[in-house]
Amino acid sequence: MTISPEDYDIPAHYKHWVGDKAEDHIGPFFFTLEGEHPRTAFRVQEHNCNAHDSVHGGVLMAFADYTLCMGANGGENESVITVSLNSEFTAPAFKDDLIVGKGKVVRRGKSMVFVSCELFANEQVVLMASAVVKLLKKR
């Protein structure tokens, strides 16, 4: 099954990362790269919301993790794992909002990448995060 960004009113130049069932169930999530910096997007659906009708914090954290890992692996089909993730919620987001992630690679080592991101809804920051991501060796 092909998952298309246009089906979620997301620009066509975004790509779907194939193979992560959890991300597809929560999102689906989409990405593009500006150099080595990821730009990510997902459209909030009803199943992403909590009892307050705002996006569940766990959904935002999962999307932040996706954004951070896209920066670490450079959008390639590389396996990575999150070693640590810190996040701060700054504002709510709601059903039908387009959540856009802007990631930044802070430092890239041989096996660890330090990354940060901000998530936006309606041009307002809703979450800030930073992480250490480990690059896994190819088998």
Predicted segment positions?
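Terminal targeting signals and extreme-terminal segments of soluble enzymes
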Residues: M1-R139
